[in-house]
Amino acid sequence: MRVRKRLLHTLISHELVDLFFFLLVLAYVRVAPYTKVEESFNTQATHDVIFHANDELNAWDHKEFPGVVPRTFLGPLVLGKMTKILARAMEVVVNSNPVTKRVFRNEKIWGELKHLVETLNEEETFVRTKMHYQVIMRMILGCASTFSLHKFHAVIGKNFGNDVAVYASALALAQFHLAFYASRPLPNIFAFALTTFALSLWLEERRGLKINSSVLDTLAIMVVSMVVAVFRCDNILLLAPLGIHVTLFRVTDIYDASLRIIANVMAMVTVIVAFAYTSITIDSRHWDQEYLWPEWEVLSFNNPMGANRSHHYGTKPFLWYWYSALPRMLLIAYPLSMYGFKHERRCRSAFMIASFFVFAYSFLGHKELRFLFPVLPLFNFCAACGMHRLNLNRKKSIKGNFLHALAWMGVIVSCAVSIGVFAKASIANYPGGEALAAFHELNPERDASGHVRLHIDDHCAQTGASRFGQAYHDHNVILYNKRQDHEHDDWFINEYEKMPKGYEIVRNITGFIGVKLNKKFPFWPPILVEKDVRVKVWRKRRILEDEQ
């Protein structure tokens, strides 16, 4: 029995669980390849980096639809260049080997993505549709997020033991939001990959290292400072408690504290100034504005003590993060993190930093789940410490054994809820992208001028109908219109129940509308995801008559 337990302990490592997490990220990319309105800017900007030269800025999407607040192009520029390089490499690999050619042309393997891929001839390349580029783009971002999370778990394993690292990895795997959003081009995810890496630097020095511990502290401060300057200014709420902790609680005397304050403040200011200058230089050109710093614009837009224009997009109660957002995002890790804070001294600083972030963010009336991504690894670390404590106590009493079993049952239930409810609902929440793909499947006929004119309404544009979903080779034939003037358009994808006389519905696209309890015997699954027609594909009846 002991040999079996040791063998099992050796085989189950956080590396293995992190591998499953990465595979889950890729699975979500495959079954939900589209992006929504929150990801719109980075998605469209990355598309334009790939398909338009820098001297063609007037053709870029942000020129026509600038959005509410300017965002930085630094992320899309890097991601777009990496996507082009990887796409070219995949073309070489796939087309140089007959086995890989057959694999990547197999519709059974591609499943739900097959309608995005035209039948490929032997001489044609693999990366043919724009949607392929979007999938590759998301794979790259998913790799970056997974690597940072793996680094964080590796540091936990090194300093707190393999069991704690496995628990942290298992909790991340059981949560829906981390894996589903890890590959999505949100500014929050660009920031998440960097802040998680910074937190691993901060956590790594809890045990003696050959390198000076203050160096890792300073590096962590520098990475978060870069995030503040470029991607998410709200991470100042993470930078502040992190800086206070490394300055006040990791010093030996007043002299050491003074040196650390000077070093960390200088590093923070230097990085913020350097990357703010970089952002201003690049973004001012792309936005065609003088001295534009996007994150300063975002800060001015969201500042609760200033104009705070974000409240026009909806507000929630002060405690909403605590009673709604965190329970949904963390699931079983939410109570376990509190248990870990109470019973495990080593994780208390992490819990306090994460709690300060959530508490400070609660003062902003406009609240969203994605705002909390930077501190999810910290809460999971605290929850993993709590599970480890339960594991140590399980043989000491019946109560300890019961709580340990209850915790693992919670992990299993969390997995079931994540996949059976959250994932199923979210996958069905991109009717705009599905409608655009369905339109291309119909092989629309050209009009007298040799064009196909499609109008995309706001709802479809916000639920997946991005530039990546548009035709690759027929981009001069199909004219996509997202403006209000649509009297010359023959095709429409929209959520309207009725259209003017002369239009015909040719395809209905279903989407997520809600969840409900299953009241029919045998009551399985207990929670049902409801779908209904969300978007319709219309075309003029004249076209139908001409084709007949």
Positions of PLM-derived features:
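Start-transfer (signal-anchor) and selected internal transmembrane alpha helices
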Residues: M1-Y28, Q134, A263-A274
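Signature aromatic-anchored transmembrane alpha helix within multi-pass, membrane-resident enzymes
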Residues: E15-F21, I272, C347-S355, F381, ...
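Extracytosolic helix-loop segments that constitute the early lumenal/periplasmic catalytic or substrate-binding loops
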Residues: L23-L26, F41-P70, L74, K81-V93, ...
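Membrane-interface alpha helices of multi-pass inner-membrane proteins
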Residues: V25-V29, A168-A170, A174-A182, T196, ...
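Short acidic/glycine- and proline-prone juxtamembrane loop motifs at membrane-interface regions
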Residues: T35-V37, F180-F190, L369
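Transmembrane-helix motifs of polytopic, lipid-linked glycan transferases
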Residues: R102-E107, G111-E112, V135-D163
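Transmembrane-lumen/periplasm boundary regions of multi-pass, lipid-linked membrane glycan transferases
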Residues: N188, V224-K367, G420-A425
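Catalytic lumenal/periplasmic loop and adjoining terminal transmembrane helix
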Residues: S284, S397-E547
